[in-house]
Regions:
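Transmembrane helix boundary and interhelical junction motifs in multipass membrane proteins
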Residues: 62-68, 102-109, 265-267, 303-312, ...
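Membrane-embedded helical hairpins/re-entrant loop segments and their flanking transmembrane helices
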Residues: 37-54, 70-92, 254-324
Length: 423
């Protein structure tokens, strides 16, 4: 018996040592990536690890977790690697920007990959292609030209479209989960958020997440094991073939780039200016460059394609995040989740009930939608932005249509009415 106990103790210590080494490696990787992403001088703004930052860190969980788990389950890619790389990029973004600058799954690619159950190398090829294209646009100055050409009402319209899509996702997919019980849980979570929206002592998001964990514990299937253990990341089995690169260019990269230009670059720059007017303005060149480097790093390591996003900033901000500490906290959570994630990834998702994720997502959607209010002094352009938002949300390739068509129409309207579009 003593010999067996010693063997068990040795196995536990070995597992803990491997976990600690993997965590240290992930943080070293994140620090190196942050140095690479910091294409401007270091920010003087400090990181604040407060309760509000901890709460705001999970403000984008309702968007990220379903897409991340959905991609892993549909494509069969290694869950540990996907979570660890995704978390390390969150940490790197927080260190580089010193803002709650989110790292999110590429939404158009995620939807196509989940629907088509694409192979991981095809998804990696798509991430590499958008990374190369965005890097060329950023470093050539093309992004600055696009930013000067696309007027503010079109950018606001893209945000309205994103807000509508996020709200519909929350209301039609996540909140109705578990039927009437799910709606009740979502209603309780929403009441908590409204009641604590101005509280700095008790952050609403942390209370809502705790509520979700309690609900998950009460409804956990009898006899079902917890998806916990220790696993280490692995590198992809193979590199994409030339044929997969060609497929990915048409199937994945083309639909994604229009959405990325509108939401990940232009709208993100605008939201940072809206929510952090006291901070130095971000350039589209910097945002595009970090977008590119993240994908060029993630794909070879077995991570999912990623981007920045205006909705993610709004979600983190709505729940209290004001510095890059929120990204470091969130990234640490994701890295640890990846290292401790075993078995079916969908089981891990059960720890965060759909109605809870839906409530967080709905708050994020409302925050994004309310950004259009700054056009209320020009009713014509407000109506134009709302029309652009409806087109972005409901038309096929809506973001590309609005980005191109909205810019052309707004230019024609300005010439005809001699009005200046607010910038």
């Amino acid at each position: 018996m003593p010999r067996q106990s010693a063997a068990r103790l040795h196995r536990v210590i070995s597992a803990e040592r491997r976990t600690a080494e993997a965590c240290f490696g992930a943080f070293e990787f994140a620090r190196d990536v942050a140095k690479l992403l910091r294409v401007m001088p270091p920010s003087p703004h400090p990181l604040r690890f407060t309760r509000a930052e901890f709460a705001g860190a999970f403000g984008d969980l309702g968007t990220d977790l379903p897409l991340l788990v959905g991609i892993v389950v549909a494509t069969g890619m290694d869950a540990t690697t996907a979570f660890v790389v995704f978390g390390a990029l969150q940490i790197a973004s927080g260190l580089a920007y010193r803002l709650p600058m989110p790292v999110q799954p590429l939404k158009a690619m995620a939807a196509i990959a989940i629907a088509g159950k694409l192979a991981p190398p095809l998804l990696a090829a798509g991430g590499l292609i958008v990374g190369v294209v965005m890097l060329i646009l950023a470093r050539s100055g093309a992004l600055e030209w696009i930013a000067r050409t696309v007027p503010k009402p079109v950018v606001r319209g893209i945000q309205v479209g994103l807000g509508l899509q996020l709200a519909m996702l929350a209301l039609t997919r996540f909140m109705p989960a578990d039927g009437a019980r799910g709606w009740l849980l979502a209603a309780v979570a929403l009441v908590i958020i409204l009641a604590l929206r101005t509280s700095h002592r008790v952050p609403a998001a942390l209370v809502v997440l705790a509520l979700g964990l309690v609900a998950a514990a009460l409804t956990w299937p009898a006899g079902a094991p917890l998806p916990l253990g220790v696993r280490l990341p692995t590198l992809p089995a193979r590199w994409p073939t030339p044929n997969e690169f060609a497929q990915a260019a048409l199937l994945l990269a083309l639909p994604q780039l229009a959405l990325s230009l509108g939401n990940s670059v232009l709208a993100t720059k605008q939201v940072v200016a809206d929510l952090f007017p006291e901070r130095e303005p971000l350039s589209v060149k910097r945002i595009g460059t970090t977008y590119a480097f993240m994908n060029l790093l993630a794909a070879p390591l077995g991570g999912i394609p990623v981007c920045h996003g205006s909705g993610g900033i709004a979600g983190h901000y709505a729940f209290g995040a004001r510095t890059g500490a929120s990204g470091i906290i969130y990234g640490t959570f994701l890295v640890l989740s990846g290292l401790l994630l075993v078995g079916e990834p969908a089981a891990f998702q059960r720890l965060f009930p759909g109605p809870i994720l839906g409530t967080l997502l709905l708050v994020e959607a409302i925050t994004v939608l309310l950004l259009v209010r700054d056009l209320r002094d020009t009713p014509a352009w407000l109506a134009f932005a709302v029309a652009c938002g409806l087109g972005a949300a409901f038309l096929p390739y809506g973001y590309a249509v609005v980005l191109l068509g909205g810019t052309v129409i707004s230019a024609a309207l300005r010439r005809r009415t001699r009005q200046t579009v607010p910038i």
